[in-house]
Amino acid sequence: MNLAAMDPQTYDAQLEHKRIKLEQAFAQFETPSVEVFASEPANYRMRAEFRMWHDGDDLYYYMFDKVLNEKVRCDQYLPASVLINQMMSALIAELKPNPSLRHKLFQVDFLSTLSGEILVSLLYHRQLDDQWRTNAAALKAKLSSQFNVNIIGRARKQKIDLDKDFVVESLQVNDKTFLYKQIENSFTQPNAKVAVKMLEWAIDVTQDSQGDLLELYCGNGNFSIALAQNFNRVLATELAKPSVEAAQYNIEANGIKNLQIIRMSAEDFSDAMAKKRSFRRLEGIDLDSYVCNTIFVDPPRAGIDPDTLALVQGYERILYISCNPDTLKDNLEQLYKTHRVTQFALFDQFPYTDHMETGVLLERTQ
């Protein structure tokens, strides 16, 4: 974290620097001009994590500034949503005078939504007892007069949910509203308004699609649910059990009838498609019945492994969302042999940092 860089007055200049850097890095692939999707310059992050500092009777949030090499007190946090900033003030006022709730509290995590829900996770270096549960329930009741809030307590090998461990986000994407269950301690897009722009872009560049869609690394179904309208059927894979459960919830909540989620890794699915191995999880699923002309991938920062990349390269169209331009560039070295980039986008999920979220659409040339 570099707090000095978080200046809304310099946001446009910082984003332009990213655009230039991205275009230069990918010039060898003869990409079209980068389409840039900006963030709000403040209050854009829907989740935030803070360490807690105990100083006598005082208690406050802090982060570590890697540039200054020191901890920085954070009574408010410019990148965090307005809802998180409001909760930060209300929560600390309740924690300070409560020994049971503040004792050995070392971290607080917030997960908020555009729909107005917020989840607060309190992390401790001690086991939580009945007294903690009673006090936490009273805290939730007090905060509920101002917020739609749920509270979770965490300690080593211990988790206490007072009610539920998730929020339900509501995203307005073009003329449709999509509901997404987001589970505590699972991956979600941190910048909800930019996430909407990503969904709208993906829908736009695939609107003339034929046949079915295959998605790898689908998470909670964020993209596959929104893209289902453009395809006959969608087959999606995800390994993490909580994400798969959230995806099934989201499929039902959004009334999606043409999407099937398989819980398995991209690597295993690649083996299944290549007929190298058979998997019990694929029993009853006729992979050969899918006519997937388009594949969608949103891999982790490490990019796509070689076997999966070979699978991806076999499709006519490849929609690739990347959170790491370096590994995207590495993967394009191979994909560029058979495909050309027809759409190129920069989504500023992480203002005031060097991180760049990118999207490319590749179409087969041979």
UniProtKB/Swiss-Prot annotation:
InterPro entries: MeTrfase_TrmA_AS, MeTrfase_TrmA_CS, SAM-dependent_MTases_sf, TrmA_MeTrfase, U5_MeTrfase_fam. One of its GO terms (molecular function) is rRNA binding. PROSITE patterns: SAM_MT_RNA_M5U (PS51687), TRMA_1 (PS01230), TRMA_2 (PS01231). It catalyses: uridine(54) in tRNA + S-adenosyl-L-methionine = 5-methyluridine(54) in tRNA + S-adenosyl-L-homocysteine + H(+); uridine(341) in tmRNA + S-adenosyl-L-methionine = 5-methyluridine(341) in tmRNA + S-adenosyl-L-homocysteine + H(+). One of its GO terms (cellular component) is cytosol. The active site is at residues 323, 357. GO terms for biological process: tRNA methylation. S-adenosyl-L-methionine binds at residues 189, 217, 222, 238, 298. Its EC number is 2.1.1.-, 2.1.1.35. Keywords: Methyltransferase, S-adenosyl-L-methionine, Transferase, tRNA processing. Belongs to the class I-like SAM-binding methyltransferase superfamily. RNA M5U methyltransferase family. TrmA subfamily. Dual-specificity methyltransferase that catalyzes the formation of 5-methyluridine at position 54 (m5U54) in all tRNAs, and that of position 341 (m5U341) in tmRNA (transfer-mRNA). This is tRNA/tmRNA (uracil-C(5))-methyltransferase. It comes from Shewanella putrefaciens (strain CN-32 / ATCC BAA-453). The lineage of its organism: Bacteria, Pseudomonadati, Pseudomonadota, Gammaproteobacteria, Alteromonadales.
